[in-house]
Amino acid sequence: MQELRFVLIVVGALAIAALLFHGLWTSKKEGKAKFGNKPLGKLDVDQEDKDTPGQERDFAPDPEDDFEIIRKDRKEPDFGMENSFDNKFSSDPLIDDVLEAKEDKEQREEQEIPAFVATKTDDEQVEPVLQEPAKAFAEKEEAAEVVEETLQPVFEAPLAAQAPEVEVAPVVVDPVVEEPKPEPEMQVIVLNVHCAGDEPFVGTQLFDSMQQNGLIYGEMNIFHRHVDLSGNGKVLFSVANMMQPGTLEHGDPAEFSTKGISFFMTLPCYGEADQNFNLMLRIAQQIADDMGGNVLDDQRNLMTPDRLASYRRQIVEFNAANA
């Protein structure tokens, strides 16, 4: 720790000595530069001051720095040229003539200036002069109006002759009435559910199965399948009594009986006809299973795959013909 302190003291002393040496060297160098840059006039004045120390000087005190000496304007010696030039110009007769002509011109201009000052008499003389063009202009306007009155009937006649009224006959356009497309002939697809033996369907069991499959009793005293299972919306297909009179009207379901029921849908129908047919076929098969009956075609023959294919082909042909 003592050695480090000693080293720091030595380094600080060396740094201070270096700064002092650099300051002395810089001040000495600047003093030489100032002496070398002094003008000759400054050196002469300093020499005279040394020769006559006791005499008073009339010029101003020395400036604070050398830059003020440099900024002062140096007076160059004229070597006696000013007096010679003045004498030459003063004795030249050409210059005297030019100066005299210039003075005469200035005097003439001063004399001519009052001619431009307007007086009351001048205004009185100018007014009649201005009134004459106004009268002439008014006379010209009156003459122009007279010419217009004389020319006006000349131009009216040709214009009336050149602009005959052209009557445009209204164009009658017969409205194009599009012929309404003929409504397609309605077709009916029929499926039947018939009892398997001689025992008929009892109303209690039959109506319960129909209601469970989304059929609702409604108009014409038959059951319908609507778009909405709550009984709202369009009817997709309907179910009627296979026997006369064709209705499923009943007071007490237990007292109602029938040999079979008929499912039917019309073409065209609401929605997709092929989907409606598939739904009707599925419900008919479900009720036949519940009641132990059979699914028959429109001719009351057992349903076969070929007969189902013919039903679907009928739907496709109907849609193609009425597309």
From Swiss-Prot:
Protein's UniProt keywords contain Nucleotide-binding: no
Keyword Translocase: no
Keywords noted in UniProt: Cell cycle, Cell division, Cell inner membrane, Cell membrane, Membrane, Transmembrane, Transmembrane helix
Spans annotated as Disordered: 35-92
InterPro entries: Cell_div_ZipA (IPR011919), ZipA_FtsZ-bd_C (IPR007449), ZipA_FtsZ-bd_C_sf (IPR036765)
Biased composition (Basic and acidic residues): 41-60, 68-78
Annotated compartments: Cell inner membrane
Regions of this protein lying in the Periplasmic compartment: 1-5
GO biological process, one term: division septum assembly
Chief location of this protein within or outside the cell: membrane
Membrane topology note: Single-pass type I membrane protein
Stretches assigned to the Cytoplasmic side: 27-323
Cellular-component GO terms for this entry: cell division site; plasma membrane
SUPFAM superfamilies: Cell-division protein ZipA, C-terminal domain (SSF64383)
Listed SMART domains: ZipA_C (SM00771)
Regions that span the bilayer: 6-26
PANTHER family linked to this entry: CELL DIVISION PROTEIN ZIPA
Task of the protein: Essential cell division protein that stabilizes the FtsZ protofilaments by cross-linking them and that serves as a cytoplasmic membrane anchor for the Z ring. Also required for the recruitment to the septal ring of downstream cell division proteins.
Family per record: Belongs to the ZipA family.
Subunit structure as annotated in this protein's UniProt entry: Interacts with FtsZ via their C-terminal domains.
Record-given protein name: Cell division protein ZipA
Gene behind this protein: zipA
